[in-house]
Amino acid sequence: YVSPPKINQTLQSLSSFSEEMRQRGQQASSRVLHATVEAANEQVARALSVLAGTEVVRLVRVRLADDLPIALESSHILAAVCPGMLERHDFASESLYQVLRQEYGLRMTYAHQTIEAQVASEPELKALECKPGTPILSIVRVTYTDADQAVEYVRSAYRGDRYKFHTELHLVETPKLHQSG
């Protein structure tokens, strides 16, 4: 068995999973596991700078590229900025960012993101159809609009055997310290 080449995502721009796959010539789709409006817990509320209990849309999806499970993604979006979204859209095939931009006028412009290597949990193993011990890239991101409003808190688990990240780094010159004699 030869494993397929890993999907290589750059870390230089903010884009949706759907946009990333389209740019690579791959078909993005999703399996929606959970889609509800619920009260934000402390962690979600803190990330979105709102009070605990504030209504959020919780959208949990398995993200697929050419029908292969790539990531398990749990998004929390402020319900106030996207009223009625779950009733009008099918996120098995539609892009969340595209809906937020086109229907609600939200322009996601930047994010704060952390990435760390972990071993997949039982729910992640099941959702991503992988074997025990499979490494994942755990990503936590808060996404902001052009009005500097935090509107999305997302936790993702990307299969380490199918996904990798790439970035280009540039040396920043630091001033030389004056050395005395």
Where are these regions (language model features)?
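All-alpha effector-binding/dimerization core of bacterial HTH-type transcriptional repressors
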Residues: 4-181
